[in-house]
Amino acid sequence: MSDEYKDDPWHANGRVVLCGANAYDRKYYFNPEFNAVPDSIKRELNIISVLFTQEAGGIFTIVFENDGGISFVTDAEEDDITYDEVSAGLLVGQIRRTRTEILESLELFY
């Protein structure tokens, strides 16, 4: 990784974080690098992320991979007994099926 992104929470392992939500601090985060994304898509990303953490718990992030593809990353604190890994997996699949248009638009944007 280049030193340019060494202490940058939005860039890690060649990935660029677009947005995410954290059930522990009940916050939504959006990478300001993508402020040019239309507001309607920003709202959809907010809804997707927050609803995910309300349903499954933990931390949910949407990231751009090196190849421009989009990945969903889910994580939970080690001692979190409320995080539902099965629900998280099902929700990721549901998002991929129902939000195809937005995901494709974001990949083109990136």
What is each of the regions a protein language model found here?
Residues S2-E55:
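Negatively charged, low-complexity tracts enriched in Asp/Glu with abundant Ser/Thr
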